[in-house]
């Protein structure tokens, strides 16, 4: 989820982490209770390729839909919930300053990057809500998790699902038991359904009309 409000325009790859439509943080804040989940904004794929080129845009879209519902100002609080989500950058920054002053851990932005990871991934108070920087940090976390999970001999899709669990919890199991991995997969299906053209279904066989 710069002192200037980020534009909502979504402005090769070393590896591609892909969730098949048919079918990352050491702390676990409440997922940001943003507005109802919506389809990826127009141009998100191009934006994702520019900001997090190591992760397939479809995978990122599913992750971001689950984490923040594409709200760049979303805030998730560890062990608690906000009464509502911020409606502006200024409100988001005021909220995170208040949380930090009380020693409360939180995650922010599109990819819900936890504040304990800011230094490692190049974020700070002035940049944590910039969509591209936030997405780049989230992509880096997921890529690191995937490198760890794929090194265990898992098949590619199993390794990706384990990486999603790692993104959520820092390990390869909690994301499954909590239902997080299933929610990301469901988001991938919803994105594919809402972003593409629905196929024509098969017609039912009906008896010929009586003559």
Predicted regions and their residues:
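Soluble non-cytosolic domains of exported or imported proteins
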Residues: 38-42, 50-58, 86, 104, ...
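Export/targeting segments at the very N-terminus of extracytoplasmic proteins
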Residues: 11-12, 24-98
């Amino acid at each position: 989820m710069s002192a200037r409000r980020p534009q909502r325009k979504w402005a090769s790859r070393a590896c591609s982490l892909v969730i098949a439509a048919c079918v990352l943080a050491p702390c676990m804040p409440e997922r940001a209770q943003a507005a109802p989940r919506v389809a990826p904004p127009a141009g998100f794929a191009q934006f994702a390729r520019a900001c997090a080129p190591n992760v397939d845009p479809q995978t990122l879209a599913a992750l971001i839909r689950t984490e923040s519902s594409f709200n760049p100002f979303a805030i998730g609080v560890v062990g608690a919930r906000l009464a509502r989500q911020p409606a502006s950058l200024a409100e988001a920054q005021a909220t995170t300053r208040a949380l930090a002053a009380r020693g409360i851990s939180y995650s922010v932005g599109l990819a819900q990057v936890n504040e304990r990871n800011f230094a490692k991934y190049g974020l700070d108070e002035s940049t944590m809500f910039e969509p591209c920087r936030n997405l780049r940090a989230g992509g880096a976390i997921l890529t690191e998790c995937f490198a760890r999970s794929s090194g265990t001999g898992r098949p590619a899709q199993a390794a990706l699902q384990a990486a999603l669990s790692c993104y959520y919890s820092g390990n390869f199991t909690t994301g499954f038991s909590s239902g997080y991995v299933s929610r990301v997969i469901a988001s991938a299906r919803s994105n594919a359904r809402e972003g593409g053209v629905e196929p024509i279904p098969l017609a039912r066989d009906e008896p010929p009309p009586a003559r």
